[in-house]
Every structure is written in C-alpha cells, then in structure tokens.
Amino acid sequence: MFPMVTEFMNYGQQTIRAARYIGQGFMITLSHANRLPVTIQYPYEKLITSERFRGRIHFEFDKCIACEVCVRVCPMDLPVVDWKLETDIRKKRLLNYSIDFGICIFCGNCVEYCPTNCLSMTEEYELSTYDRHELNYNQIALGRLPMSIIDDYTIRTILNLPEIKT
C-alpha cells in the first residue's frame, strides 16, 4: 500500500511541475500579446531598404570609359564589355555593356572599383522572371532607373519596424 501512496504523491508532484511549465510558456505568450506585429503584408507593404542596400546595378553609358576594371574585380567575371579602339583619337569606344543577374552575386566590387562611378547599386530587388534569359540586362536595361518605393502610391512603406525586446 505504501508504494501506491508514494506513486500517487510523485504523480501529484509531476502534475504540479507540468502545470508550472505550461504556465511559464503561457506567460511568455501573453508577454508578446502587447507588442506590435513584426510581419508585413509583402506585396502591399514594403520595408524601405537601407542606404547601403546592394540591389540591381544601374549603369550610365556616357560615363563608361571601357577600362574593364569591373570585369577584373568581379569574382564571377560577369560584366560583358564590348568596345572598339578609335585609332584617330586613340581611345576606346564602348559598344555594348551587359550583366547577367542570374549569375551576379551582388558583391558590389564593380561599383566600388569603377574609376568613373558609372555603376551604382539601386534599391531594386524584385528581379524574378519566368525565363532566366530575361535576367541578362544590356546597357539600356541597366540604364533604367527603378521606381522608388517611396514614390509608389500603391504601396504602403514601413519606415521603422518595432524593436524586439529581449
């Protein structure tokens, strides 16, 4: 009979311990109830990207001197620079410039080392397509400035996320 009483007492202690653990978890859940939601409704709400965000590369054709520094510093040897040597003025003339964003790792080396600052990073990050060949941007597509999220009236921008308290 005594073993049965001790088992019943152990069962009671285990029940109290389990209820305490459940209560602790419930208290953590309730402590999060008064916080603002962290999630955003993506297609309709977007976060404003930081100033140093590395998005799609913008290219200014008139500034480029076809020095190919961007090709040399790129870890993927990605930018394709076609140029022709003008013998009368002894300078290179840029014919075509293209970057395949399906291969680009957005490291920013080409932007950092460009001597004429003809390359810059934009805040555009929505580059998905159904055909991977559409990710190969020529100088015309690279020269197009993206629409700013701030200027788009159909999208609600979120400036500050609520800080997570630890």
Swiss-Prot record:
| Gene3D superfamilies in the cross-refs | 3.30.70.3270
Q: Which reaction does it catalyse?
A: a plastoquinone + NADH + (n+1) H(+)(in) = a plastoquinol + NAD(+) + n H(+)(out); a plastoquinone + NADPH + (n+1) H(+)(in) = a plastoquinol + NADP(+) + n H(+)(out)
> What cofactor(s) does the depicted protein rely on?
[4Fe-4S] cluster
Please state where this protein is localized: Plastid, Chloroplast thylakoid membrane
Q: Does the keyword Ribonucleoprotein apply?
A: no
- Principal location class: plastid
Gene Ontology CC: chloroplast thylakoid membrane
What's the record's note on cofactor binding?
A: Binds 2 [4Fe-4S] clusters per subunit.
UniProt-recorded Gene Ontology molecular function terms: 4 iron, 4 sulfur cluster binding; iron ion binding; NADH dehydrogenase (ubiquinone) activity; quinone binding
Task: Give residue ranges for domain 4Fe-4S ferredoxin-type.
Answer: 55-84, 95-124
Q: What top-level branch of life does the organism fall under?
A: Eukaryota
Record keywords, A-Z: 4Fe-4S, Chloroplast, Iron, Iron-sulfur, Membrane, Metal-binding, NAD, NADP, Plastid, Plastoquinone, Quinone, Repeat, Thylakoid, Translocase
> GO:BP terms for this protein?
photosynthesis, light reaction
UniProt keyword Transmembrane present: no
Q: Where does [4Fe-4S] cluster 2 bind?
A: 74, 104, 107, 110
What is the enzyme's main class?
translocase
- EC id: 7.1.1.-
Its membrane topology: Peripheral membrane protein
Q: Which residues bind [4Fe-4S] cluster 1?
A: 64, 67, 70, 114
Matches recorded under HAMAP family: NDH1_NuoI
Q: Quote the function comment for this protein.
A: NDH shuttles electrons from NAD(P)H:plastoquinone, via FMN and iron-sulfur (Fe-S) centers, to quinones in the photosynthetic chain and possibly in a chloroplast respiratory chain. The immediate electron acceptor for the enzyme in this species is believed to be plastoquinone. Couples the redox reaction to proton translocation, and thus conserves the redox energy in a proton gradient.
Its quaternary structure?
NDH is composed of at least 16 different subunits, 5 of which are encoded in the nucleus.
Q: Which PANTHER family match?
A: NAD(P)H-QUINONE OXIDOREDUCTASE SUBUNIT I, CHLOROPLASTIC
Similarity section = Belongs to the complex I 23 kDa subunit family.
- Its name, as the record gives it, is NAD(P)H-quinone oxidoreductase subunit I, chloroplastic
